[in-house]
Each structure stands twice: as C-alpha cells, then as structure tokens.
A protein has these predicted regions:
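Short coil/turn segments at the loop-to-beta-strand junctions that recur within blades
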Residues: 34, 40-45, 89-93
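Short, conserved, GDST-rich strand-edge loop motifs in beta-rich repeat architectures
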Residues: 58-73, 134-135
Length: 143
C-alpha cells in the first residue's frame, strides 16, 4: 500500500488503499473486509484523495513500473470512473472497462501526492523530480 483514505461519498464509509504495483485502488469495509478494486490500468497510483464527489491521485509511474520521468494526475467521479488525467491520456472505456492510461507530454515527473484547496485547485508534488516545486493546477469555472 502507498496511501489510504476514508471514502464516505456513498453515505457508507469505506477504506480506499492504493495498490500501486497492481495499478488499482482496493476498497475495504471499516472492519477490513475486502469489497472491490478500482482498476487503473497503466497508472501506478499514490494516495487517494477524496474531495467532494471525486477521487484525486498522483500517478508516480505511467505505463511501466519505474519508467523514468513519467506520471500524471488522475481524477475519478462518484461512480469511480476516470473522468480526467491532467498530464495523461484521455480515459477511454470499452465494454465498461478502462483501457490503459498513460502520460501524455512531459509536464510531470513522478506525481507522488496531490491536495486540493477549498476552491478545488490541485497541488501536485513530484518525487525524484530534480527539486521541482509543487505545481498548482487551477480549477476552471464550469460554464
């Protein structure tokens, strides 16, 4: 595990655990019973961050474990479907299953964690990124 969060978006609290090498989040009851997995093919995810109706996470590696200078941010909706990957490929579902997602461009290096402020801006910290400062992704207004 490389991160954990309590997810109460459904009205019932569960525990979300990042399973980085399995490219997924695993969901457990508060008593430790395994419930399900959220598959994120190609995304070696870090700590899940629950904010309002979404889950946000840094992706430390993309495509292949330990791939140098890769990574992006992934955002899942209230149905646990990937809806956006800043710095990564557009999510595509086929027969209800997420196709592999990967870094697109070279904005990020090993996104290791994210946090959000009250306005919904995302702050991304990077690991092993030659001393790079955190990056702020500003939320655009919905119109």
């Amino acid at each position: 595990a490389h991160g954990i969060a309590i997810d109460g978006r459904s009205g019932v609290e569960t525990v979300l655990v990042s399973s980085r090498e399995n490219t997924c989040f695993k969901r457990y009851s508060l008593t430790g019973e395994y419930l399900s997995s959220i598959e994120l093919h190609g995304a070696y995810v870090c700590r899940p961050v629950v904010h309002e109706e979404n889950i946000y996470a840094g992706v430390c590696w993309s495509g292949k474990l330990f791939r140098p200078n890769s990574g992006f941010v992934t955002i899942l909706d209230k149905s646990d479907r990937v809806v956006s990957n800043p710095g990564g490929s557009e999510p595509f579902y086929e027969n209800g299953k997420l196709k592999s997602i990967r870094q697109h461009g070279s904005l990020f290096k090993h996104c290791h964690d994210v946090c959000l402020d009250a306005a919904g801006n995302i702050y991304v910290c990077q690991w092993n990124a030659q001393g790079a400062y955190p990056i702020k992704l500003e939320r655009l207004s919905e119109s």
